Amino acid sequence: MKVLIIYATTEGQTRKISEHVADQLREAGHEVALRHCADWQSDFHIGEFDRVILAGSVHQKRHQRELEIFVPAHLSELAGKPTLFISVSLFAAYPDGMAEAQTYVDEFLETAKWRPSGVVLAAGALRYDEYDYFMEQIVRHVVLEGREDAGSRGEHEFTDWKALSDEVNAFVDPDPA
């Protein structure tokens, strides 16, 4: 099966997730193409693939602008394929944040007029060493809002790799024999 993975990333966690999914699918014997949506080439056609996975992350209550542009621009091609949307956010790291994470997905899909076959809410990562003071304050006081953040320095990854792999397997092979 030919699978296309298209992603947008801000701090690199969505790229890491997309690479993980690509490796998982290749190991299962699938042919995989991995592309950043900003690097999309006009001679590359979604129609060549059996399934399409799009991944993006939430920052300041919305997904990346390039993903917001990409999806509507390719909506007719996406509509004819089984598609999976992986939305990465810190809200998905906490049970009480899942509803908010879903709200950002719903807003994105409504604006894009896209109805993927499936949606995965994946927890992101904290990268304190890459944040300036302003971004660190947003993370602490808006995103985390008193939640435990596993420390205040370095990188803290919240992605549940097994759950992600299980969701991707179910999408690619919905009827395992």
Predicted regions, residues:
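Secondary-structure boundary elements
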Residues: Q24-G29, D173-A177
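Short, surface-exposed acidic/glycine-rich loop or hinge patches that mediate macromolecular interfaces
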Residues: A8-G12, D39-W40, S57-K61
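FMN-binding flavodoxin-like domain, especially the glycine-rich phosphate-binding loop
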Residues: K16, F49-V52, G56, Q60-A177
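Hydrophobic anchor at the start of a short beta-strand
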Residues: V3, V32-A33, T83, S117
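A short beta-strand-loop structural module common to alpha/beta enzyme folds
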Residues: A28-Q41
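Conserved beta-strand termini and adjacent loop/short-helix elements that scaffold enzyme active sites
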Residues: I6, R35-C37, A122-G124
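N-terminal beta1-alpha1 ligand-phosphate binding loop
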Residues: K2-A28
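Short amphipathic alpha-helix with an adjacent loop that forms part of the alpha/beta core around
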Residues: Q41-G47
